Design a protein with these regions (language model features):
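ATP-dependent adenylation/nucleotidyltransferase module used to activate substrates
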Residues: 1-141, 147-150, 155-156, 177-185
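Short, surface-exposed acidic/glycine-rich loop or hinge patches that mediate macromolecular interfaces
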Residues: 63-64, 173, 196
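Short, acidic/turn-prone active-site loops that include or flank metal/cofactor-
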Residues: 148, 156-158, 194-199
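Short, flexible loop segments at boundaries between secondary-structure elements
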Residues: 153-178
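Substrate-binding/catalytic lobe of Class I Rossmann-like enzymes that use SAM or dcSAM, i.e.
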Residues: 181-199
Length: 199
């Protein structure tokens, strides 16, 4: 997949669901994985020719694992000329040491999103972009069917009224295979998660 195709997929999702308006300040959640780096690259590319002017701010929630190195992500954001914030937390200690959770992912996700949303508001952003793609939509829907007995998945665009924050998912029309191909072609600095629960 080339950059032009990436921009095309991303722009179509943004236009179809009215994800970006004039003057938006969009935080992009960066895990260091292939999906979030692709999203950041796509949005930066779209900034050059999208009819609505918007700003970006990359942000990573550091869960507190000692072996996480974000230097490559810092350099990547610097190359793209996007401000980058690392939010340091003790979430790993709370989940694994204090609470000793047998199923840590759910609590970690809640705490991570809570910390992220608060920091985003502090930065003055009005939207947060997540890098969920088409495969994530299908997987979430199937998990919902298996565990809840209903078809349910996340929306392309969601307004969080308590936070006065809008969540957008611009990679919705892309397959994971497309993302992998793009990351490999452009040699993005993917950072492996140090989390012991991350298969």
């Amino acid at each position: 997949m080339d950059a032009q195709r990436l921009y095309s997929f991303t722009r179509r999702a943004i236009d179809d669901y009215d994800m970006i308006a004039e003057g938006d300040y969009i935080a992009v959640g960066i895990s260091g994985g292939k999906d979030s780096l692709t999203l950041l690259y796509a949005l930066k590319g779209l900034m050059r020719f999208y009819p609505h002017k918007f700003k970006l701010h990359a942000i990573t929630v550091d869960l507190g694992f000692h072996n996480l190195n974000l230097e490559k992500i810092k350099s990547f954001c610097k190359e793209l000329d996007i401000p980058y914030t690392i939010l340091s937390t003790q979430i790993a200690q709370i989940v694994f040491d204090d609470r000793k959770e047998s199923n840590p992912c759910s609590l970690c996700a809640k705490m991570r999103k809570g910390a992220l949303n608060e920091k985003i508001k502090e930065l003055g952003c009005n939207k947060i972009a997540y890098a969920h793609h088409k495969d994530d939509v299908v997987e979430t829907m199937l998990m919902s069917l298996i565990f809840e007995g209903r078809f349910h998945t996340f929306s392309p665009k969601t307004y969080l009224d308590r936070m006065d924050l809008t969540v957008i998912r611009p990679l919705l029309y892309m397959n994971e295979a497309d993302v992998i191909g793009f990351v490999n072609k452009y040699d993005f600095p993917v950072v492996k998660s140090p989390c012991p629960a991350d298969g």
